[in-house]
């Protein structure tokens, strides 16, 4: 029987775990820290999970991460994120040549979140 890969969870570096958990909470994720003082936490929305790892040496200008979030309605997510007041760079939404409607959001830790839904 072939081995099945069942899920993936990116681990992104953050400078301050508590600040990152609050940011993801404001973006609509359920968040929690793992243990006390471990510098590790989770942000989950639906079946999507992003792991957060506090890293003292993290420099958003030199190290970063990219996650692609497949969603049912990228326009609705962009509108939601635009209204939540989270610090970062929110890009315009656009249709791509590869059949997605997507936008990008770079948070204060330098993580690029590309968010897209399939074009009809």
Where are these regions (language model features)?
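N-terminal beta-strand motif that seeds the catalytic metal site of vicinal oxygen chelate
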Residues: 1-19, 65-67, 118-120
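Short beta->alpha transition motifs characteristic of CBS
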Residues: 11-13, 54, 97, 104, ...
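Core segments of cupin and vicinal oxygen chelate
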Residues: 11-49
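Vicinal oxygen chelate
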Residues: 15-18, 67-112
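Short acidic/glycine-enriched loop/turn segments that link adjacent beta-strands
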Residues: 36-39, 61, 96-101
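Active-site beta-strand termini and strand-to-loop segments that position acidic
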Residues: 42-48, 105-108, 118
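Short, charged/polar surface micro-motifs in flexible loops or helix N-caps
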Residues: 46-50, 57-59, 73-77
